[in-house]
Amino acid sequence: MEIRRRPPNPTVRVENLEYAVPHREAQAKNILEEIVWHKDIEIKNFKKIVSLEDLIKKIEKLPTPKDFYKNILESKIKPGVIAEIKKASPSKGVIRKDFNPENIAICYEGLGASCISVLTDKRFFQGSYEILETVRRSTNLPLLCKDFIISAYQIYKARVSGADAILLIAAILSDDDLIYLKKIADNLKMSVLVEVHNADELERILKLKSFNLIGINNRDLKTFKTDLKTSIELMHTYADIFLKQNIIPISESGINCAEDLESLRSIGIKGVLIGETFMRETDIEQSFKKLFTSI
């Protein structure tokens, strides 16, 4: 699935008149493309408030990031759980009205989650870097900044806000971008979870030989529907390669019951990222225990 970057001139002049109309190539083809295009604007606005140089100075005073990979690998719960804090989504709207990031983070840690994922996209998911900062103050678990990263600036901002790891999405980044952004994260000693949606994207990632955390997203980017067959089919083909290369495969999205977890664990999935299943339930603790006590 090709995700285009925002055209530099979203409007075109009509003859000599003093107005412009939208360029036909300036219309996003899908929600993912719309999100990515908005990131360009968002990053420019962030830079007006805090410069990259100021972020770098702040990072120099921070402790070493926590080990995301190790926490999943050594998790007592199998597969290891990346529990997500997410208020809303483009497809479902507000998922959790009673949204208290601090209490949710404390709950996740007490239940045995390996790591916590925090949505920081504001426009489409009602997240923020302020929420990430709140969660950082509330837990000792490694934190993943869950966003649509297209710029090094976002990585530095994530680190300053308390993230130990970032998400890179293969569908929105070229190979050169993936290598460059991974290098930035490596320099900051941050972990990188790279996300794929199909075999073509996974092949790209494996050829780069740079990633030891690979997330298989079960969500179709065109329809936003989820299907665990994505993880199952890719694991059937690539499980041995993951094992040989010490790659931790993580299944993301569409995990709703203990049977789902058992089927994923049985095919070699080492970690799961679960958000909406917890967020839509009034009692997160009960929802968590219902998923994990029987496996």
From Swiss-Prot:
One Gene Ontology biological process: L-tryptophan biosynthetic process
GO function terms (MF aspect): indole-3-glycerol-phosphate synthase activity; phosphoribosylanthranilate isomerase activity
Superkingdom of origin organism: Bacteria
Upper classification of the organism: Bacteria, Bacillati, Cyanobacteriota, Cyanophyceae, Synechococcales
Gene3D superfamilies xrefs: Aldolase class I (3.20.20.70)
Name assigned to this protein: Indole-3-glycerol phosphate synthase
Protein's pathway: Amino-acid biosynthesis; L-tryptophan biosynthesis; L-tryptophan from chorismate: step 4/5
Keywords: Amino-acid biosynthesis, Aromatic amino acid biosynthesis, Decarboxylase, Lyase, Tryptophan biosynthesis
Substrates-to-products reaction catalysed: 1-(2-carboxyphenylamino)-1-deoxy-D-ribulose 5-phosphate + H(+) = (1S,2R)-1-C-(indol-3-yl)glycerol 3-phosphate + CO2 + H2O
A Pfam cross-reference name: IGPS
PANTHER family: INDOLE-3-GLYCEROL-PHOSPHATE SYNTHASE, TRYPTOPHAN BIOSYNTHESIS PROTEIN
Family classification: Belongs to the TrpC family.
InterPro entries found in the cross-reference section: Aldolase_TIM (IPR013785), Indole-3-glycerol_P_synth (IPR045186), Indole-3-glycerol_P_synth_dom (IPR013798), Indole-3-GlycerolPSynthase_CS (IPR001468), RibuloseP-bd_barrel (IPR011060)
EC number: 4.1.1.48
